[in-house]
């Protein structure tokens, strides 16, 4: 059973904090956190990501970027990444974690979710839509696993 989920992207300021908060919204009983492979440690959410999230009534307030580590990975039951190359990078950091690493877009035809960092607001909106859809799909799958409707 997956009760603790870690969401991973590169900087931990755009995609993973948004995905973290969306998973918490759709499945409040989960423990969800996020981290980055090349995190902008200590930074808050990207202003464009925060603005788009806010437009959808989702707050990224008080987010603080942190760096992924093998130790951090071991604390979670499931690790969700935005891109396939992130899976490979995590396996380099902690090879024993491979069996619990999947794409955030797994239920959406194994879709990779592109990085909107330093791109247009439209790019952030498109990524938000992908993240929201995938978060809903994960919440449904996790509810089914736990025998909930």
UniProtKB/Swiss-Prot annotation:
MF-aspect GO terms: protein tyrosine phosphatase activity
Highest taxon in the source lineage: Bacteria
Matching CDD domains: LMWPTP
Pathway(s) served: Glycan metabolism; exopolysaccharide biosynthesis
Active-site residues, Swiss-Prot/TrEMBL: 9, 15, 115
Catalytic activity line of the entry: O-phospho-L-tyrosyl-[protein] + H2O = L-tyrosyl-[protein] + phosphate
Keywords associated with the record: Exopolysaccharide synthesis, Hydrolase, Protein phosphatase
SUPFAM superfamilies assigned to the protein according to its UniProt record, in alphabetical order: Phosphotyrosine protein phosphatases I
SMART domains: LMWPc
GO biological process, one term: polysaccharide biosynthetic process
Family label: Belongs to the low molecular weight phosphotyrosine protein phosphatase family.
Protein name listed in UniProt: Low molecular weight protein-tyrosine-phosphatase Wzb
Origin species: Salmonella typhi
């Amino acid at each position: 059973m997956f009760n603790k989920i870690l969401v991973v992207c590169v900087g931990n300021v755009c995609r993973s904090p948004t995905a973290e908060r969306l998973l918490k919204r759709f499945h409040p009983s989960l423990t969800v956190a996020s981290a980055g492979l090349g995190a902008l440690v200590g930074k808050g959410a990207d202003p464009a990501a925060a603005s788009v999230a806010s437009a959808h009534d989702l707050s990224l307030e008080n987010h603080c970027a942190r760096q992924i580590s093998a130790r951090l990975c071991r604390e979670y039951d499931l690790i969700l990444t935005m891109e396939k190359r992130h899976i490979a990078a995590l396996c380099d950091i902690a090879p024993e974690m491979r069996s619990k690493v999947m794409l955030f877009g797994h239920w959406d035809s194994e879709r990779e979710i592109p990085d909107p960092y330093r791109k247009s607001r439209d790019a952030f909106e498109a990524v938000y839509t992908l993240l929201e859809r995938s978060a809903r799909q994960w919440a449904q799958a996790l509810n089914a696993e736990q025998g909930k409707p």
